[in-house]
Amino acid sequence: ASDVYKRQMYGDPLPEIVQERLDRELNSIISNGYAVMYIIAQKLVWKSNEDGYLVGSRGSVGSSFVATMSGITEVNPLHAHYLCKHCQYSDFDSDLVKSFSGRSGCDMPDKLCPRCGKPLSKEGFDIPFETFLGFKGNKEPDIDLNFSGEYQSKAHKYTEVIFGEGQTFKAGTIGTLADKTAFGYVKNYYEERGVHKRNCEIDRIVLGCVGVRRTTGQHPGGIVVLPMGEQIYTFTPVQHPANDMTVDITTTHFDYHSIDHNLLKLDILGHDDPTMIRMLQDLTGVDPTQIPLDDKAVMSLFQDTSALGITPDDLVNCQLGALGIPEFGTDFAMGMLIDTQPKEFSDLVRIAGLSHGTDVWLGNAQTLIQEKKATISTAICTRDDIMIYLISMGLDSEESFKIMENVRKGIVAKGKCDKWPEWKQDMIDHNVPDWYIWSCEKIKYMFPKAHAAAYVMMAWRIAYCKVFYPLAYYAAYFSIRATAFSYELMCQGKEKLEGYMHEYEKRKDELSKKEQDTYKDMRLVQEMYARGFEFLPLDIYKSEPHHFQIVDGKLLPALNTIDGLGDNAAVAIAEAAKDGIFLSKDDFRERTKVSKTTIELMSDLGLFGDMPESNQLSLFDFGA
């Protein structure tokens, strides 16, 4: 199927550059025995797509063109090129295309196919395969996939269909004692026995306790696969998480890191982006895979607020339209956007790399950009940048790969790389600038470019809907990503909301975690109001348990936005409402099992209208 797909896309015979990349990758994948991982990942992704959910790739699997052609990842790692999907014309080596080396194909200007006159597709992110498997296939690959949180459990179940019942197990985790907990245990032990110990002795005993197993759990997405004909007990005991026999889940007893060299582990993780994109597709009818990655209005969200039709004065402490966009909506990320002034998709990929690394931006790239020693284009943003740049400066490719691996894992920064003095001298001998070497010595962890590209593609699609389908965007965001939405605080109009925001601002250093989350949601609600959109009053008969709805050009809030009303209670109200109207508040409480306090709050918010307190009629009701 992959062979048919690639020839449908690139033509038959394949362009030389495509054939060469496929041959090089396949040789490395097959000779090292990794083909089975690709086939499993392909089956899982195809099944999810068939059921209506996109899958995002994590990590460096997007570096593999074989993964792209297998449908495992949407990231095309070839260098920027034009492609006609009607007649298979391709352009890999015109001067214009070559000028986009190291950048994303989607940033190239629009062109028509010289052969058939149709608009050309702009492809490629220029990512080397070696980031995934190394130059000799000697790096163990890891195919991590982001499934919709709503679909994750189905994907886990589907592994049983692929391998058979009893062949897959949830990966176990081991929770160990942390410093503070161990200190508490030791201190309490001696206090309870009336024994006085010096602090240095307590510290000595604490050191012996730190790291000791405390409990067991399960990895959020790890599935361990057993080879046919083997028993799991050959490799590890199995158990229920935290030894809870009532739980219907079996995990490996050993931490999966202890056995992942002996057994295949699949990372089937849950993520909000695919869920949100599915909801946006349902609300708008727009196919997310057809959203252009070069729309100027969408790009402007990362520069100012003009595409939203508002000014920064309409918002509290926000100069951009990036609020609520995955990867870019935090104050930290927006500060980076203001500092770096992105102009194209490639810049966003680089910024995503900077923002997710450790000691890559603060005290590193930010300083270099401020001192005009580097730009967003020349600073080290993703791990691939190091290898590509060093090879371009004339260093040996295998050595460049090893330098990249040691820098991106923080081994160099921690002073634990014995080869670093030799490599550093080699870099100096090849005229690598001092600032570049200084930057390498600071980095503690780096993202792969493929991961950054995959995440930015998802974020861009959501940003596109924010510009062109605002109500659908806000409905999806408040349904899926908002963590502390409050009907009482946010849906009573712009003035009331801003009053609450002002109150939160005054004590911003004292806000609890829940209040911080509430304030984060308030900012997006304020933006929605500024764009001229409103909420309808919540309706106990029409509102859905968890999802906001678009009704008559306004948003109808979900039931679970009422403070104190949990997800289960919201479902109970929706189910009870299907059985007919509530005769009274007593009837409502009886049928929904909602607490008295919550009913009083709902009553104060006017959600019951003129509903009587009880089913009993008074003589005064007849006299009315």
Predicted features along the sequence, with ranges:
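Noncatalytic, beta-rich nucleic-acid-contacting surfaces in large DNA/RNA-processing enzymes
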Residues: S2-A624
